[in-house]
Amino acid sequence: MKEYQVYLERARSRQQDFLYPLIFREYIYGLAYSHNWNRSIFVENGGYDDKYSLLNVKRLITRMYQQNHLIISTNDSNKNPFWGYNKNFYSQTISEGFAIVVEIPFFLQLSSSLEEAEIIKSYKNVRSIHSIFPFLEDKFTYLNYVSDIRIPYPIHLEILVQILRYWVKDAPFFHLLRLFLYHFSNWNRFITTKKSISTFSKSNPRLFLFLYNFYVCEYESIFLFLRNKSSHLRLKSFSVFLERIFFYAKREHLVEVFAKDFSYPLPFFKDPNIHYVRYQGKCILASKNVPFLMNKWKHYFIHLWQCFFDVWSQPRTININQLSEHSFQLLGYFSNVRLNRSVVRSQMLQNTFLIEIVSKKLDIIVPIIPLIRSLAKAKFCNVLGHPISKPVWADSSDFDIIERFLRICRNLSHYYNGSSKKKSLYRIKYILRLSCIKTLACKHKSTVRAFLKRSGSEELLEEFFTEEEEILSLIFPRDSFTLHRFYRNRIWYLDILFSNDLVNDE
C-alpha cells in the first residue's frame, strides 16, 4: 500500500492525477511483477517464466510509444508489428500494467476509508475468507429459508468498462483499455460469450478480476442502499464483509445519487432478519420470515441486474429452499442446518411431562466427491478415488517429493479444519499419502511393499497424520483429552486470504 502511494504521488506531481501516463512507466510493471511473485498460492508456488524481465518491459514500452493506438483497427492486428509478435506475452504484460495502474487510486481510497472508520487495526482479520463461517454459525441457526444465487456475468466487457468510468475520469486511459480489450478478447462481437470471457479471465486474471469485482461492488452498493431504505435497523453484521470493498466511502456518494430518485419510502415489505453473504460470483440470501418476502427480494435482484447493469438473469435459476432441508455450497464447504431433537422429562407435583426440545446446529462438511474429482484431475488418483503415482514428479529427490505432498496435505488441513466431520478430510490425506508412496516406488522402480521395507520410510511418511496434532499441541495444553477434543472440533483460521486451488475446481 505504501508503494502504491509513492508511485501515485510521483505521477500526480507530473500529470495531475491522470492514470494514462502511468501505463508507460517501467516501475509500474516492476511493481506488478513483484506483487505476483510474492503472492502465496495454496497447492504450488507459482511465478512467471524467464520472459518476464524489465528489459522486455522496457522494449514493450518503447514500442508502445511509437504506435498510434487510436488508429489501429482490429483487421490490421495481425499485420501490425506491435501486436504481431508473441501476442500472449504482450497481452499478459499489458494487462498487468492496466491492473496495477487502475488499482492504485482505489487502494488509497480503501486505506483512507478504513482509517476514517477506525477499523484499520482489525482489517487484517476481516480479510480472512474464513471469517464468513463464524458469521454463518452465529446467524443461520435462527433462519428458516435460504436462496443460493449465482451472480450473472455481463454479456459484454463494455459494461464493466462503463461502470469503471463513473469513478475514473481519464478518457485516454479508457481509450487504451478498450483498444487492449478489442485485440485480446474478441470484443468486436456484439455479445461476448461466456467461453470467451472465461478464456480472457484465465489469460488476464488480475485485470478481469478487478473489473468483475468492481461490477459486483456496484451491484452490492445499490442493493445495500435499497436494503437500508426498506428497514429502520442498521446492518452491523452486513457491513463487516463489505469493508473489503471500500464501502464506507461509497455509501455517502450513493445516498446523494439516489436521494432524488428514492426520496419517498420504498414500498418494500419489512424484513429485518435478512442476511446476505457473498464470495466470488456466488451469494447466499437467508431470511427467517415467510418465502413470500424472499421471493420479493429475488425479483428485486433480477430487476436490479436487468435495469442498472443490462445483465439478463432467469428467475427460475434462483431457488428458495428451507434451510433445514437444503445444503448450500460456499468456499468449498457444504453447509446445512441440522435439527437436533432431545426429550426432557419434567415433573410438576405428581404429574410427569415429556418435553421435546428441538435445537439447530450448522453443519459445515467437506465435499468429498468434488475434492476427489479435483485430485483425479491433478493425477493423484483415479475417478473412483484410488491413489495413483505422480510420474511427472519422479525426477525430483525423495525429500522434494515428500515435501510437495506434505505441503498439499498441510494446506488442505489448514483450510478444512473448520469441518464438522473430519472423516472426509482423513480420506483425502490417505489418498495423498498412498500417492506419495507410489510415486517414490515408481521413481526407484520398485513395488510399494518392497520400497517401504528397503528404505524404512514409514516413520517419515507418518508426518501426514502427526503434523496436525503437533501444531495443536503447541496451541493447547498437552492433555490427551483436551487435545483430542480440540482436534475433533472446528478450528477456523483468520489468516486464509485465498481459497484452496482444489476448491476452485467445481
From Swiss-Prot:
Keywords: Chloroplast, mRNA processing, Plastid, RNA-binding, tRNA processing. It is found in: Plastid, Chloroplast. It comes from the Eukaryota. GO terms for molecular function: RNA binding. Signal peptide: none annotated. InterPro entries: Domain_X (IPR024937), Maturase_MatK (IPR002866), Maturase_MatK_N (IPR024942). The keyword tRNA processing applies. GO terms for biological process: mRNA processing; RNA splicing; tRNA processing. Belongs to the intron maturase 2 family. MatK subfamily. Usually encoded in the trnK tRNA gene intron. Probably assists in splicing its own and other chloroplast group II introns. This is Maturase K.
